[in-house]
Amino acid sequence: MPQVETAMGSIDVDDIGMCLMHEHIIIADWDMRQNYDDYVDVEKEVPKAVGSLNKAKERGVKTIVDLTPVNLGRDIRSIIAVSKASGVNVICPTGFYWTEEAWMHGWDANHLSTYMIRDITEGILDTNVKAAIIKCATDHTGVDEFNKKLLHSTAIAHRETGAPISTHTTVANSSARDQVAAFKEFGVDMSRVVIGHLGDSTNIDYLEEILSSGCFIGMDRFGLEAFLPTDERVQTVVTLCEKGYAGQMVVSHDACSFQDFFDGEYVEKFAPNWCYEHVPRDVLPALLAGGVSQADVDTMMVANPKKIFSAKGGY
């Protein structure tokens, strides 16, 4: 039986169960944290995250994938603490966000990939917890020269280790299309890639174009009503299931118990359902009511995550 690394050690892929494939626990910039002691109160935020995950756990969630990149504030010790206290498996990430960090400019893709490979093969810091998925991102700047270097480094680490790739995209510039093209150029097996945030789009032709590459797509921002209302997100998934694509979709929120992008009270006001329990509590019943079969729900929530983490070995 294939295994996958988590914050609590390796588990059989059969034990992943219902899985939210694109989430975050704590996002907080490390430069700020190291210079301002009160930037984030981890002792407060860890129990808060545990409480939020416990609500999802009560509704059947067994595993989440934390996709916080290294340079977006990945906090492996908090991830471990939250996983242990909640009993929810957390699959941990490596990889870099789309932002142009000054230190990156003097290094090529091969050098950047060495850090990801180390996280996957040796473990993160001194924790012995190994990353099991590679995060990368393309945003409003698109796949420019710098971003292509990041995608190339991701591809190198993926092909060396076999760890799957999960991405951040924006629908405003159709960056998913350019990510697919770049990964194909770098020899990536697209069946081992999740192209993220495509649930922000209702353009079925565009989604089918991305799906035709053989990748998975993330319908993974449920609860972000400001980007797209839940009913429209649900209908898009319903339509794609009717077209036979359940085997290539994963469903999640891109939620975060704490993030330094916004004031917490503001988030609760503009996105009250942007939380780990929204999918099992509200979205899955809505999909069933919309005509999606229980078998297709199980495929998206259980079988597809298992498949993503079952493919092993570099190539």
Language model: regions and residue ranges:
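Short acidic/histidine-rich active-site segments
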Residues: 67, 166, 220-221, 245-269, ...
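Mid-to-C-terminal alpha-helical segments outside catalytic/metal-binding sites
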Residues: 2-9, 274-315
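Divalent metal-coordination and catalytic microenvironments
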Residues: 22, 64, 158, 217, ...
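Active-site gating/metal-coordination segments in enzymes
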Residues: 81-84, 89-161, 216, 222-226
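Histidine/acidic-residue-rich catalytic or RNA/ligand-binding cores of hydrolases
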Residues: 29-33, 76, 175-181, 203-211, ...
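Alpha-helical scaffold segments that flank or form the walls of functional sites
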Residues: 17-26, 34-89, 110-130
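Catalytic pocket-lining loop regions of alpha/beta-barrel enzymes
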Residues: 159-242, 248-249
